[in-house]
Amino acid sequence: MSDLSHIRNFSIIAHIDHGKSTLADRFIQICGGLSEREMEAQVLDSMDLERERGITIKAHSVTLHYKAQDGKTYQLNFIDTPGHVDFTYEVSRSLAACEGALLVVDAGQGVEAQSVANCYTAIEQGLEVMPVLNKMDLPQAEPERVKDEIEHIIGIDAGDAVLCSAKSGMGVPDVLEHLVRVIPPPQGEIEAPLQALIIDSWFDNYLGVVSLVRVKHGRVKKGDKILVKSTGKVHQVDSVGVFTPKHTEMPDLKAGEVGFIIAGIKDIHGAPVGDTLTLSSTPNVDMLPGFQRIKPQVYAGLFPVSSDDFEDFREALQKLTLNDAALQYEPESSDALGFGFRIGFLGMLHMEIIQERLEREYDLDLITTAPTVVYEVLLKNGDTICVDNPSKLPDLASIAEMREPIVRANILVPQEHLGNVINLCIEKRGVQRDMQFLSSQVQISYDLPMNEVVLDFFDRLKSVSRGYASLDYSFDRFQVANLVKLDVLINGDKVDALALIVHRDKAHQKGRALTEKMKELIPRQMFDVAIQAAIGGQVVARTTVKALRKNVLAKCYGGDVTRKRKLLEKQKAGKKRMKQVGSVEIPQEAFLAVLKVDS
């Protein structure tokens, strides 16, 4: 075996706001990756969106050189991971390239559901997990309680957890020292044929596809001809290097290292994430086990406001898909909105982020329809189909049963907020599976319908628990449910983009709330606009946007009642004629009203 004992590959697992990006900044400062002038808070969160929202969305990598107390200089390859539940697959990708992970826990708040889930992923992949308690400078830090929680909830020994404060820099060198001792070096053979895993890739307008890779065996240098295993295409390497976090070219990348490869690949699908690279001279190297393809949980239609932008929109989506392996899309057309795409997302945050990235980075104006989850429908002829768009639902007469996706949700919540959280879960049709009392927190697990979870469950959970509850969920199974399709009719015409699939018990209430909401949003016309919610042929709710009308009696001072009646009848006839030919413009807010209706 080649000597790779000076290399350490690790990533940081932490819940949102537990300080992993700040800790990364401290590592970069201590190892001198950037000069004082270039240093800014959250160096690795390079997207404007990440900085504004204060969350990490994409995985980033940095190579640092750390001179340890034993006199050796270690090469630390650090891969930053996101902490939000919607980006779990980014985490599993980052972990596939590491031998160890730092579990960063806020010493004041304690363990949160998200870190638990990511920590299990790390342990399953055989990584060495090293606990670190952050935010020790806060007065409310309780290291002993949090160590107990780590041992109880996650089940790893936290006796020698390192205490630090990334903000003030206290204890950060201890973290690095500990890391070099605890995390094992990579295994690999430099002289063997090249075998490298693509962790991430993104599209650069000048360079083509830039791939972030972890080299398992062998080496790759500029001028090599590389073969992408899944496509079978050969490309010539233009440059290889690492991020320190600056883009730094290197003569070569060797086994055990993490860095980037640019090979002038112009085809967006040329280097899929999770693929294996090798040299064209050794084409029969085995594929590395990648990571499972992630299935989108939420689907929504996105349509360009002006139909001329359709091609630009398609191109923008292709570039984003390269960078975001979880995006899936297919063309869709709607009577109300024209041509667009039906896009699959991992959750609501993911959807918002993608929409914002499309609008900002590619300068598009988009309309989004209400998101839905995937339902399984068993037809009377025995076929089973998956429906991700309410307007594609077959006729009710041909459906034998409908099944909705159920998620298993794990919620960690302080005891004083337990009652509120349980009420929320019951309101969302949840079934309790398990409850465990840990020192000051309670861990409850519920089976919840996914369509109740994806829309606003996360926000509601935070508000009923004053921000202390944390949530992690994963798809469990499909279960038969009494579901119906709720259509919205405006002046008797169905608007396909507003259809919803809802539980029959909630259909009337949802229909009423939705029509009331639409009434506020649709501007008044010169004629009455009827807004109806219907299940099949049965109208369950109706409101009317009253017409704007001129006061035709203003010129009559006194006089005979028949004169007034004649003028009113004439106006009425005019309005009736108008209603037959008039069409109603539906504003963008109305399409999103569907989300805002609290069931």
Swiss-Prot record:
It is found in: Cell inner membrane. It catalyses: GTP + H2O = GDP + phosphate + H(+). It comes from the Bacteria. One of its GO terms (cellular component) is plasma membrane. GTP binds at residues 17-22, 134-137. The keyword 4Fe-4S does not apply. Gene3D superfamilies: 3.30.70.240, Elongation factor 4, C-terminal domain, Elongation Factor G (Translational Gtpase), domain 3, P-loop containing nucleotide triphosphate hydrolases, Translation factors. GO terms for biological process: positive regulation of translation. InterPro entries: EF-4 (IPR006297), EFG_III/V (IPR035647), EFG_V-like (IPR000640), EFTu-like_2 (IPR004161), LepA_C_sf (IPR038363), LepA_CTD (IPR013842), LepA_IV (IPR035654), P-loop_NTPase (IPR027417). It is a peripheral membrane protein. Its EC number is 3.6.5.n1. The keyword Nucleotide-binding applies. Its main location: membrane. Residues 5-187 form the tr-type G domain. Keywords: Cell inner membrane, Cell membrane, GTP-binding, Hydrolase, Membrane, Nucleotide-binding, Protein biosynthesis. GO terms for molecular function: GTP binding; GTPase activity; guanosine tetraphosphate binding; ribosome binding; translation elongation factor activity. HAMAP family: LepA. PANTHER family: TRANSLATION FACTOR GUF1 HOMOLOG, CHLOROPLASTIC (PTHR43512:SF4), TRANSLATION FACTOR GUF1-RELATED (PTHR43512). Belongs to the TRAFAC class translation factor GTPase superfamily. Classic translation factor GTPase family. LepA subfamily. Required for accurate and efficient protein synthesis under certain stress conditions. May act as a fidelity factor of the translation reaction, by catalyzing a one-codon backward translocation of tRNAs on improperly translocated ribosomes. Back-translocation proceeds from a post-translocation (POST) complex to a pre-translocation (PRE) complex, thus giving elongation factor G a second chance to translocate the tRNAs correctly. Binds to ribosomes in a GTP-dependent manner. This is Elongation factor 4. It comes from Azotobacter vinelandii (strain DJ / ATCC BAA-1303). The gene is lepA.
